Curated annotation (Swiss-Prot):
Keyword Cytoplasm: no
Keyword Lyase recorded: no
Biological-process GO terms, alphabetical: symbiont-mediated suppression of host cytoplasmic pattern recognition receptor signaling pathway via inhibition of TBK1 activity; symbiont-mediated suppression of host NF-kappaB cascade; symbiont-mediated suppression of host toll-like receptor signaling pathway
Keyword entries, A-Z: Host-virus interaction, Inhibition of host innate immune response by virus, Inhibition of host NF-kappa-B by virus, Inhibition of host TBK1 by virus, Inhibition of host TLR pathway by virus, Viral immunoevasion
Coiled-coil intervals, chain numbering: none
Record-stated family: Belongs to the asfivirus DP96R family.
Function in brief: Inhibits cGAS-STING-mediated type I IFN expression and NF-kB activation by inhibiting TBK1 and IKBKB/IKKB. Inhibits host TBK1 phosphorylation.
Organism superkingdom: Viruses
Protein name: TBK1 inhibitor DP96R
Region (Disordered), start-end ranges: 66-86
Transmembrane parts of this sequence: none
Pfam families given in the database record: UK
Length: 136
């Protein structure tokens, strides 16, 4: 028979006693008040001498996220409308507007729009056609 040297500092909670259960739940210590404190100095993402973000400090995390750089200039500017409310035809129309402005094409065609692409209004058809002919 083994002996256990564990001696709890507090009386264990009887899980069958409802009043003890609620007392244990109500005595949980609260989180620190700094969670919603936004008065701390914001993290400057351009200053490399800035101290690193403490990932355990919620206010520093949110400051780093809120100070994140905008999208790069070449990125397609899809409106802020959520994807759930935007139909696929609306999304494709906005996508092609960005390409015609000379923005980079994401994913399968990372390049500028060419005159050959203007002849193929279907998504990336020009690029796919050219890539198939290269294999011949």
């Amino acid at each position: 028979m083994s002996t256990c040297n564990y001696s709890p500092k507090e009386k264990p909670v009887d899980v069958n006693n409802v009043s003890e259960k609620s007392a244990a739940v109500n005595n949980v210590p609260e989180k620190p008040a700094i969670v919603n404190n936004t008065s701390e100095k914001a993290v400057d993402v351009n200053n490399v001498s800035e101290k690193p973000v403490d990932v355990n400090n919620v206010s520093e995390k949110s400051a780093a996220v809120n100070n994140a750089l905008e999208k790069p200039a070449g990125a397609n500017n899809i409106p802020e409308k959520s994807a759930g409310r935007m139909t696929s035809s609306e999304w494709i129309a906005e996508y092609w507007k960005g390409i015609k402005r000379g923005n980079d094409v994401p994913c399968c065609c990372p390049r500028k729009m060419t005159s050959a692409d203007e002849k193929f209004p279907v998504f990336c058809k020009g690029y796919l056609m050219r890539s198939m002919h290269k294999d011949d």
